[in-house]
């Protein structure tokens, strides 16, 4: 089973949401990214997501910005394949980001 940020494992049968307020490797295993929810403390707070384990070697998937003090859900038209894991780089003025993802085993079975 794919790993989780806390070192546990996640069954490959459902989407999950991982919240964070700091830079974080969401998973080291292949996965699909379904969307993000950005909670910013100021307009323009930003979060950048990568296919990989860090910002330096990962493939940038996109930078997502939010308005202040509201939930900013960002859905993707279709899941994005992340073959090298998912890394989130929390930028300025972010209270929390919720990363919606699922292990690749589930994605392949759908």
Predicted feature residues:
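Exposed aromatic-hydrophobic patches
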Residues: 71-79
């Amino acid at each position: 089973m794919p790993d989780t940020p806390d070192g546990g494992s996640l069954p490959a049968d459902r989407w999950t949401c991982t919240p964070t307020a700091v830079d974080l490797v969401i998973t080291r295993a292949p996965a699909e990214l379904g969307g993000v929810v950005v909670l910013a403390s100021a307009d323009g707070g930003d979060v950048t997501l990568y296919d990989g384990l860090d910002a330096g070697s990962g493939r940038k998937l996109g930078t997502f910005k939010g308005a202040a003090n509201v939930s900013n859900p960002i859905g993707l038209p279709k899941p994005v394949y992340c073959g090298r894991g998912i890394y989130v780089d929390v930028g300025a003025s972010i209270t929390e980001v919720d990363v919606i993802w699922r292990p690749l085993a589930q994605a392949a079975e759908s």
